[in-house]
Amino acid sequence: MVVKKTTQEPKSIKAQITRASLVVAAAAIMQEEGPSAVTYRSVAKRANTAASSTGYYFDSISDLLYEAGDYNMRSWARRAESVADEAEEMDVASCREHVVDLFLSACMPADTGTAAPHYMQLLAASESGAVTKAYRAGRIRLDAAIGRIIERVGLKDVTPRFVIALVDGAAVSAVSEGESAHRRARDLLAEWVYPVMRRDGLLAEEHGSGNGN
């Protein structure tokens, strides 16, 4: 699927603000209800603009969905990059001690109440080729940020995608069972990473017992 850039590029500051507000509105709707809920009318209502404005700035819903998906992905990448910055500012021992919290903060929304909607909308992304395209493209930055944490901790033979898959898998299973996504992901991260770090001499034997709590 090819998503072309809209031909209606805003020229004035006011127009740029209006267009940006439409992207933000679409991104919010997508996070709350999934791509299928993003329509010209729903986005205009959310952004408090004229219904015709959405069609003016975007050639199609696919164009809008792509930009909304890109907006969401960049937001998640910035969150992960901020956590990676924090990890690199720590001394190595502190970074290793807090590795579970760092991975969790980089991979999941901080607000525990948004975990279920977050993962439901990720699963719903398959409804739109434009959204999956945006998410695939944006994954590079997210992977790079997780990779920086892995490198700072000193973990060997671990990829960012493994960490993300572990967290996401734990979260989705918890959501499906009506349990805390953050708690399940935290427990599974601790169950995996602490034994690996002790095995590789990155952590004292006594540290990380009891799921890292």
Please describe what each predicted stretch is.
Residues S21, A25-E67:
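Helix-turn-helix
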Residues S21, A25-E33, R79-S82, E86, ...:
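Solvent-exposed, amphipathic alpha-helical segments
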Residues M1-I17, G201-N213:
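N-terminal intrinsically disordered/low-complexity leader segments
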Residues D70-A77:
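Short, basic, alpha-helical segments at the C-terminal edge of helix-turn-helix-like DNA-binding modules
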Residues M108-T132, R139:
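Amphipathic alpha-helical segments used for helix-helix packing
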Residues E81, L104, L122-L123, G147-E151:
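Amphipathic alpha-helical segments within well-ordered protein domains
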Residues A80-T114, V163, R186:
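Hydrophobic alpha-helical connector segments
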Residues V131-R136, I140, E151-N213:
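Hydrophobic/aromatic-rich alpha-helical bundle segments in the mid-to-C-terminal region
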